[in-house]
Amino acid sequence: MKYIGAHVSAAGGLANAAIRAVEIDATAFALFTKNQRQWRAAPLTTQTIDEFKAACEKYHYTSAQILPHDSYLINLGHPVTEALEKSRDAFIDEMQRCEQLGLSLLNFHPGSHLMQISEEDCLARIAESINIALDKTQGVTAVIENTAGQGSNLGFKFEHLAAIIDGVEDKFRVGVCIDTCHAFAAGYDLRTPAECEKTFADFARIVGFKYLRGMHLNDAKSTFGSRVDRHHSLGEGNIGHDAFRWIMQDDRFDGIPLILETINPDIWAEEIAWLKAQQTEKAVA
């Protein structure tokens, strides 16, 4: 079964994220559990936790259908010790918030070397950051998102994801989220079913589908291999509709949150309905 949704706003209270997901007929959703552009946030109150859990139960969202995202400020591979520790502390807090909310996944961008350390050193720092966070939490899986490779961001190669996983001690609590726009911008073609087959055969060989814990379904304003992260509405960008239809018809993508981060929230309900309709092999438009 496909879980399909979008990254919805939690403005006004975390419980509102579930309500907004229902409003677009989503069977999955993503959210920030705190302001994603601030380092610190007030601790979750018992009321906030209870209201969120009640809303999820009311609208039938289990933790398998929810993919929280951490702060954009966090860099788990930071080359400077003091800044690395700050990021690690913030990541642990994000993981603990998920644990309190009964959520089993936390999606995050792996990190950047900032042109100051080697890729290998940065990837090792990211893996160690995950180990530290897993040691201080229970029941939450760290879900590494592939990147477009802008600037000095790592995670744009499947080999980067595999290297991080290799350095994580608890393999049961680490996974990956594949963003289609990021993959395309990083040089993984998705424009035809044949290219999708090739790209995900590479993914299966290098990383492994057992680690796939979520996806971000985004078309791309950016061009193929450009290393530029620019999302677009489904079918409106340089990837086109075929990739998303292909994903909907492949059962390897069942049972994980498939999340839209496309640029026009006003048509998320339409995009979700279209994705749901593609699950039959007869779907061609």
UniProtKB/Swiss-Prot annotation:
Its Enzyme Commission number(s) read 3.1.21.2
**What cofactor does its activity depend on?**
Zn(2+)
Where, in this chain's numbering, is Zn(2+) 2 bound?
Answer: 145, 179, 216, 261
Among the GO molecular function terms of this UniProt record, one is: DNA binding
SUPFAM superfamilies given for it? Xylose isomerase-like (SSF51658)
Q: What class of enzyme is it?
A: hydrolase
Cofactor: binding comment: Binds 3 Zn(2+) ions.
Q: Catalysed reaction(s)?
A: Endonucleolytic cleavage to 5'-phosphooligonucleotide end-products
The answer to keyword Iron applying to this record is no
Q: Name one GO biological process term.
A: base-excision repair
The residues that hold Zn(2+) 1 are 69, 109, 145
Q: Which InterPro entries does the record associate with it?
A: AP_endonuc_2, AP_endonuc_F2_Zn_BS, Xyl_isomerase-like_sf, Xyl_isomerase-like_TIM-brl
Could you list this entry's UniProt keywords, alphabetically sorted. DNA damage, DNA repair, Endonuclease, Hydrolase, Metal-binding, Nuclease, Zinc
User: Which positions does UniProt annotate for Zn(2+) 3 binding?
Assistant: 182, 229, 231
Sequence similarity: Belongs to the AP endonuclease 2 family.
The free-text function statement in the UniProt record for this protein reads: Endonuclease IV plays a role in DNA repair. It cleaves phosphodiester bonds at apurinic or apyrimidinic (AP) sites, generating a 3'-hydroxyl group and a 5'-terminal sugar phosphate.
Which NCBIfam families does the record associate with it?
nfo, PRK01060.1-4
Which HAMAP family does this entry report, sorted A to Z? Nfo (MF_00152)
| Full protein name | Probable endonuclease 4
Q: Which organism is it from?
A: Shigella sonnei (strain Ss046)
Q: Which gene encodes it?
A: nfo
